[in-house]
Amino acid sequence: MSTIITESIKPVDPTIIKKPNKLRKEVVNLINQRIGDEYTAHYFYRSAANWCHNMSYKKAAEFFDAEAADELLHAQGLQKYLTDWDVLPTIPKVETNVQFENLAEIIVRAYDMEFGLLQSYSENSKVIFGMDQATYIFLQEYIKQNTGSTTEYADLLNALQLINPENNFELLYFENQYFG
């Protein structure tokens, strides 16, 4: 039987209330940074959806509406993880108003952002692996999600290579094919 389990079955003074264990400060700092990244992604996609709605890219707008909602869920999941560990999250300030020139630019920037998120989660997992297995396992879901997002945007980038992004008709065809 392990020492931890052996110690937990010994009688304790009922007048002493033990505080729960918390995550290490380094782990909390990394998760707070990812919360900021997820909110940045949320507002990026929210701005992309608004831009697409305004430009009548209706299918792309729906797609980016869903992306914004997903990123918000990711931020909320990270915050819940911290509060479940009795840690109050620190939500950093993020850019909330992003400007775009065209649909192709949104896709390129989204790919860069998703790839950056994937790299950040992967690097964080390497750091956390040796110090906190529970958080390491928790972050694997975020790596999986960002791997899927990165490959999805890579496919869109590849499809953009087939058209002239300066040609509005081709962009409308692209939107219909890949966001429909």
Question: Model-found features: residue ranges?
Answer:
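Iron-associated oxidoreductase/ferritin-like identity signal
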Residues: 1-180
